[in-house]
Amino acid sequence: MEDENTTIIMASLSALSPSHLTNLTHSILSISHHHRRRLGAVLSSPTLFSLTLRHLLSLSLPDKTHLIANHLLSLLHPLLIHRKHHSSYAVTMKLRDLDAVVLLLFLCETHQLHPDVLEASADNWREILGNTYSNNMLSNNSGLWTCDAGILMPYIETLVRCKRFVDIMGGYNHLRRRDQKEGYQVPAARAAVVALRAVEVFNVAASNAGEVECVICKEEMSEGRDVCEMPCQHFFHWKCILPWLSKKNTCPFCRFQLPTDDVFSEIQRLWEILVKSSELHVA
């Protein structure tokens, strides 16, 4: 599964133009620096480490899953920001949650590479993890981070690990919700609805070479009135589309998906876009 996810991401990156790849690399470098600074701050402060670890240990497994899912969503955002008609909105995490997730991921990485390290008393974890972090930083400063591969590969590895965890934990719970209610739908994100364009019917008819019908109510759109234009360039009465989008994030005509505030559905939406872009590149 990890190899498949890595292949999808790499194929999607290969489809980018040089300028888009450069912009993406700069964005990822900025994000990575921010995450490393937060992890360094947690490990260097006894008080902050204690508070962050306590917060992390207080979270249930579903809460940890949601935490990692939000982190994954924030990592996916830079990959989609340049894609036309496929908008995504940057995820803003509380500082306490960001500190918790970067510490959690570092604990998992440390346990995977050095299983015996965390068998020590938790009172010694900050010192042990701090030394491990310092050694990693010294290794990274050898020049690896000056090339695109050195910036992208750690990002891809983190993204794939988070995706795998969410697929196992969050995906299972998400499928259960779908099974509980056939035809399960999620509403469109409020920000996505607010961003929809208002277009005059005269201009709509001109661009479509004739009269336009709202497929929700099956009535023609009155000339001179403002109607809603979806990113897929389909048009609807505002009074029809707003109730629709309060329940479903899809276009009534073509099933184009708007962003949603449901974290697991949004991950699935963005991942499907990446899969399609990778398939087009391979084809």
From Swiss-Prot:
It is found in: Plastid, Amyloplast. Its EC number is 2.3.2.27. Expressed in seedlings, hypocotyls, roots and stems. Present especially in hypocotyl and inflorescence endodermis, as well as in root cap columella, tissues that act as statocytes. The keyword S-adenosyl-L-methionine does not apply. Its main location: plastid. GO terms for cellular component: amyloplast. It holds the Pfam family zf-RING_2. SUPFAM superfamilies: RING/U-box. This is E3 ubiquitin-protein ligase SGR9, amyloplastic. It comes from Arabidopsis thaliana. The gene is SGR9.
